[in-house]
């Protein structure tokens, strides 16, 4: 999912997911669409997407991705532009997708304090290459947070 998901602005959330299901060539029912919308906590699904907040758009993007029951979700800056409540809601949703639905989630983000609350494993990329992978357990054993770890290992 890209940082700012793109949708047909004059469609409702249900219509967006229906179009996506047809495009993907999947046998997805109206019930599947309703489940996906419920799972991401998207309410007021009769509203046009043009009237959605950024948080609602992020949720719709996640519902669209989840509709095909992926094993892997790749997210680019999923909390950018969200208020603290929206950030917490997306964080809880991502944790739920991972734990309850067994989905692996790969997140690209510059907000290390937030990532440290979601991730099990961190990969650091420099010049397009993964230069280090470390678990959050290992970082916590050093009694530092993810930002301190990054600063001490990559800003010499």
Question: How would you label these PLM feature ranges?
Answer:
Residues 48-55:
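Conserved ABC ATPase signature
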Residues 88-100:
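Helical segment within the ABC ATPase nucleotide-binding domain
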Residues 69:
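Conserved catalytic motifs of ABC-family nucleotide-binding domains
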Residues 73-77:
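Catalytic Walker B motif of ABC-type/P-loop ATPase nucleotide-binding domains
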Residues 62:
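Hydrophobic anchor residue at the start of the ABC signature
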Residues 18, 22, 28-44:
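Conserved ABC ATPase "signature" region
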């Amino acid at each position: 999912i890209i940082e700012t998901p793109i949708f047909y602005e004059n469609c409702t959330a249900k219509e967006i997911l229906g179009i996506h299901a047809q495009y993907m060539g999947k046998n997805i029912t109206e019930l599947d669409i309703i489940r996906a919308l419920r799972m991401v906590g998207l309410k007021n699904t009769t509203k046009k997407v043009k009237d959605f907040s950024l948080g609602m758009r992020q949720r719709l993007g996640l519902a669209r991705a989840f509709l095909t029951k992926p094993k892997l979700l790749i997210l680019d800056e999923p909390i950018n532009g969200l208020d603290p409540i929206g950030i917490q809601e997306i964080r809880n949703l991502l944790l739920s997708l991972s734990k309850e639905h067994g989905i692996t989630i790969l997140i690209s983000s510059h907000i290390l304090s937030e990532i440290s609350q979601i991730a099990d494993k961190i990969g650091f990329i420099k010049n397009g290459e993964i230069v280090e992978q470390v678990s959050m357990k290992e970082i916590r054993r050093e009694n530092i947070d993810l930002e301190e770890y990054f600063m001490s290992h990559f800003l010499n």
